[in-house]
């Protein structure tokens, strides 16, 4: 029986959930043995991983840029190491290269047996260091989004799912959403995150993120919002919220950046925004053209099928079997 040790930032990390822990049940069904250690700020967790690592055939290090001395010891003790990442973690949040982060990133990629990147942009960095770098998109359980949810009779809901680290992208386009609301009147933003927002010109419903609750709110919305800025950091994003909206069968309006522009077929399964002023007219167009809306809704569901976790698991398992 092959034993896999997942090392992640912890169960509260979305990357850990969707790129590592999500697949534990599938591995177990295929007769693998899996264990998970969250590498939090406690030194004891790091030591526990080192003490036990020799018992495992594969170490799956997800996203964490551990200190080089720690990884050096991990490499000595581990039989095989897979490094997985889904953000431009070698950059500062402003898009500039971080010397400290890149040094760790380079060392970890170089010494790993396999590297999984979330998109082509990220792969381009890692593959220069390790030729065994493969793209594994962040996927989801599409069935989870096929819940029964009624749309509001009072509001036309625009949903956004995010985090305090990404709320700046939503804040940048709220003035444009407010302008759209001047014409449609009933718009409401459903903000699913850990940040509370408010506006005098458009209604905002703040929803604390919860795995099950998010399915209901996404499904009940009319449109999904995915704003980004034009930065290298944004290019490292893997467009997961677009997949969430698509799985729920709602069209998306997104910035024409990075993976967003790869997933969205303009005016087929969503609308790509090139400048902030386009948000207003795109929302109005999509909500007033019923035929266009229904076409995009149908095509959104088709897109989501290609990113179901079951397909991704088979790709991951084949890479582990054939490349390690």
Predicted regions and their residues:
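Conserved catalytic-core segment of nucleotide-activated headgroup transferases in glycan assembly
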Residues: 11-26, 141-144, 153-219
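Membrane-proximal helix-turn-helix segments that form the acceptor-binding/catalytic region
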Residues: 47-55, 69-77, 97-115, 128
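A short, histidine- and acid-enriched strand-loop-helix "catalytic/donor-clamping" loop
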Residues: 82-97, 111-114
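Carbohydrate-associated surface elements
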Residues: 121, 139
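Nucleotide-sugar-dependent
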Residues: 165-168, 212-217, 222-247, 254-262
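Conserved acidic donor-binding segment of nucleotide-sugar-dependent glycosyltransferases
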Residues: 266-277, 285-291
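A short, well-ordered alpha-helix in the C-terminal region of glycosyltransferases
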Residues: 292-306, 318
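C-terminal alpha-helical cap of glycosyltransferases
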Residues: 309-324
């Amino acid at each position: 029986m092959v034993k896999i040790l997942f090392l992640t930032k912890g169960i509260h990390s979305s990357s850990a959930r969707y790129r590592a822990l999500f697949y534990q049940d599938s591995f177990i069904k295929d007769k693998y043995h899996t264990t998970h250690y969250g590498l939090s700020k406690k030194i004891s967790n790091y030591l526990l991983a080192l003490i036990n690592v020799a018992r495992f055939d594969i170490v799956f290090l997800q996203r964490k840029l551990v200190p080089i001395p720690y990884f050096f010891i991990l490499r000595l003790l581990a039989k095989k190491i897979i490094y997985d990442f889904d953000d431009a973690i070698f950059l500062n949040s402003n898009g500039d290269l971080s010397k400290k982060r890149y040094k760790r990133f380079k060392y970890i990629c170089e010494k790993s047996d396999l590297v999984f990147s979330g998109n082509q942009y990220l792969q381009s960095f890692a593959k220069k260091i390790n030729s065994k770098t493969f793209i594994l998109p962040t996927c989801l359980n599409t069935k989870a989004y096929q819940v029964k949810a009624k749309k509001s009779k009072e509001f036309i809901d625009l949903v956004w799912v995010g985090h305090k680290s990404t709320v700046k992208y939503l804040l940048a386009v709220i003035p444009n959403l407010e302008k759209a609301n001047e014409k449609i009147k009933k718009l409401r933003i459903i903000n699913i995150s850990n940040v509370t927002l408010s506006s005098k010109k458009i209604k905002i419903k703040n929803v604390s993120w919860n795995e099950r609750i998010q399915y209901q709110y996404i499904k009940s919305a009319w449109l999904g919002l995915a704003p980004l800025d034009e930065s290298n950091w944004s290019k490292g994003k893997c467009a997961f919220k677009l997949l969430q909206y698509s799985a729920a069968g709602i069209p998306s309006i997104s910035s024409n950046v990075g993976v967003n522009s790869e997933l969205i077929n303009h005016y087929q399964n969503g609308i790509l925004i090139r400048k902030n002023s386009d948000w207003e007219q795109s929302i109005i167009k999509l909500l007033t053209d019923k035929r266009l809306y229904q076409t995009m809704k149908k095509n959104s569901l088709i897109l989501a099928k290609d990113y179901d976790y079951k397909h991704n698991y088979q790709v991951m398992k084949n890479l582990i079997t054939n490349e390690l």
